[in-house]
Amino acid sequence: ADCILAECGSNEWFGKIAPAIVIEPGVSVTANVFSYVSKIYQVKEIAGQTFLTTDGTVFDVKPTMHSNNLPYAFYAHKSDSETMWANLVGSTCMEKDVILTDIAVPASIAHGDYVRIDGVGAYTIVLSPTFINYLSPIIELKDGKAIEIRRRQNIADVISLYKI
């Protein structure tokens, strides 16, 4: 940073204009910007593997579709100390809609349970397309209360963008 500032300080244009230099750190150094909570809709076995289908998509969690598993926690209606291995997948028809792979999940996981994925953020809000699903709501937890920052998108929102 010092070498950049020294160079800028010696440049006549920078002296006259005095622009602000903003350095955007990106995902790699961002802490837990958001946590994403999604509902489990289906637990199914295919060719000896367990798949948990959620109401979200990989775009809501990691729109760059990287293969790293983010930190996660399950909230099951039944407590169970036994675990099983599963893949957490999204609700689209795309083969690449894989959110987490080969993860330990409660053996009692079922429809209606929830998963929280941490470390989500930075680019997820701007890179999440409205492909098959609407934009998710954004909820802030403050002093134990849920505050809606952005409501869930609906069909009226999408149609209102068109002059039809």
Task: Please describe what each predicted stretch is.
Residues 3, 9-164:
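Charged (often Lys/Glu-rich) extended helix/loop segments that serve as interaction or gating elements
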